């Protein structure tokens, strides 16, 4: 494990250019086998999982062994996975609905709770909170309720605040960060 903690050099990440390169050099591991690497990354050690700094960790609600897991989230994964999906969806929608008035109103934004915790200049919490905290500024102008209300912890209080903030808004779509919002709020 120590050689893995020395960084990506163990896998030769600098030379990985294709999927085949990656799959032949980086072994598939169970979470329990890399927990020490996750812990080191959460304590600020970099170049373990990704060449850029990892400062975000999505905290799972527990899966295989009923314990929460911390999943490293890079800026690149936010941009190229989580945000790209939304951009692709909007591109397809507008390609097929050229006269859409979607952006003449706002999107009702629902996400999990804002339970972000800072430790060693790294942060962990619900994936939806991480996504909402990192959305581009323009997303704030086309979404309701506010960032603060979107990430409130208590569902009943949050629901009242959502109604209050959106009652007079022209809501035309719904944004639901399903990775954990479904578990937290939709039962």
Predicted segments, located by residue:
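Active-site phosphate/ATP/adenylate-binding loop shared across adenylate-forming ligases
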Residues: 1-182, 187
């Amino acid at each position: 494990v120590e050689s893995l903690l020395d960084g990506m050099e163990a896998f030769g990440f600098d030379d990985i250019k294709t999927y085949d390169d990656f799959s032949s050099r980086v072994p598939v591991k169970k979470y329990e086998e890399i927990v020490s690497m996750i812990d080191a990354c959460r304590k600020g050690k970099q170049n373990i999982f990704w060449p850029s700094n990892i400062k975000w960790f999505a905290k799972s609600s527990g899966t295989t062994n009923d314990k929460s897991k911390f999943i490293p989230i890079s800026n690149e994964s936010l941009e190229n996975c989580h945000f790209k999906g939304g951009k692709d969806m909007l591109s397809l929608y507008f390609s097929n609905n050229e006269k859409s008035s979607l952006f003449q109103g706002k999107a009702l934004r629902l996400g999990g709770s804002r339970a972000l915790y800072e430790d060693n200049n790294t942060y962990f919490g619900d994936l939806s909170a991480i996504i909402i905290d990192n959305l581009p500024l323009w997303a704030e102008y086309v979404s309701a309720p506010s960032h603060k209300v979107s990430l409130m912890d208590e569902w009943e209080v949050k629901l009242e605040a959502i109604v209050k903030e959106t009652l007079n808004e022209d809501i035309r779509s719904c944004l639901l960060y399903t990775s954990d919002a479904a578990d937290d709020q939709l039962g």
